[in-house]
A protein has these predicted regions:
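Glycan-recognition patch characteristic of GH18 chitinases/ENGases
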Residues: 44-60, 64-66, 72
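Basic/polar, cationic surfaces and motifs that engage anionic cell-wall
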Residues: 1-36, 40-41, 48, 67, ...
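Residues marking the start of alpha-helices
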Residues: 110, 207-208, 231
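Short capping motifs at secondary-structure boundaries
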Residues: 204-205, 226-229, 247
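Short, charged early-sequence alpha-helical segments and their helix-coil boundaries
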Residues: 230-241
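Acidic, Ser/Thr/Pro/Gly-enriched interdomain connector segments
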Residues: 169-214
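Acidic, glycine-anchored loop motifs typical of Ca2+
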Residues: 156, 210, 214, 233
Length: 247
């Protein structure tokens, strides 16, 4: 199952107030629900409700950084939306955010039945996270109520947690093969692109779009600093060797 999440731009998200980089891989995925009935199962209807979630989280006291969830999934359609995404720490599961991702079912899964499409999307999303190195190969899928005094993620979602977990063989630990170093990778215009950029992005945990932009350069600097290398945001022979030959 190939997932193409609806982007934040498409669902008209407000920009985050701030972001906190998530450490990876995490070993927990928590399932939530919005606890609000969803009557319009079109993309525009789901997006409207997701925007209301974001406004609600913005208006918390103290205010939250963004919509709390990493990803959101339509209760009937199974359509996937990007929340904070893989790169940023979620804010939905108190005391667990530093070691988990949060997936929210858009709707109320006690008063509404979660669909097989939604279950399949959650399972595929988790498998994608493992394959890309964001989720550890050994992980736990839990409901919010397992770690907090709440009815979340609703009854029909909670009853299907086992179905949301990918089977062994459906997921595999990421294997990053070192692409050869040709030109030095650096931030410039036109942007540098290609397989090597994707390999770098997989290592540093930035968006895997294959484009060496500001976020990737920033991720490389953080990676270089943590590995006691010269911090310049450039992938040259030393950084390339350390990044791909470390194991």
């Amino acid at each position: 199952m190939i997932l193409e999440p609806v982007t934040r731009t498409t669902w008209k998200a407000l920009p985050p107030r701030w972001t906190t980089r998530q450490k990876r891989p995490v070993d927990h995925i928590f399932i939530h629900h919005g606890a609000t009935l969803l009557g319009d199962h079109t993309e525009s209807g789901e997006a409207r409700l997701i925007r209301s979630y974001q406004r609600h989280h913005y208006n918390k006291v103290p205010p939250w950084a963004d919509v709390a969830y990493s990803f959101l999934v339509g209760i009937e359609s199974g359509r996937v939306y990007t929340g904070r995404g893989w790169r940023n720490r979620p804010g939905a599961t108190r005391r667990w955010n530093h070691r988990s991702y949060a997936i929210c079912v858009v709707g109320d899964t006690t008063r509404q039945q979660i669909s097989q499409q939604a279950i399949d999307s959650v399972r595929a999303l988790i498998a994608q996270g493992v394959a890309r190195g964001y989720i550890a190969p050994e992980f736990h899928v839990k409901g919010h109520r397992d770690v907090a005094s709440t009815e979340c993620p609703g009854d029909t979602a909670y009853d299907t947690l086992n179905e949301m977990r990918p089977l062994r063989g459906q997921v595999a630990a990421p294997k990053i093969i070192a692409p050869p170093l040709g030109k030095l990778l650096r931030l410039r215009r036109p942007r540098m692109r290609g397989t090597l950029v994707r390999g770098v992005q997989a290592n540093v945990g930035t968006a895997d779009d294959g484009v060496y932009g500001p976020h990737t350069a920033s991720g490389v600097k953080i990676w270089q600093a943590s590995n006691k290398l010269k911090v310049d945001g450039i992938v040259g022979p030393v950084t390339h060797k350390a990044m791909f030959d470390a194991g």
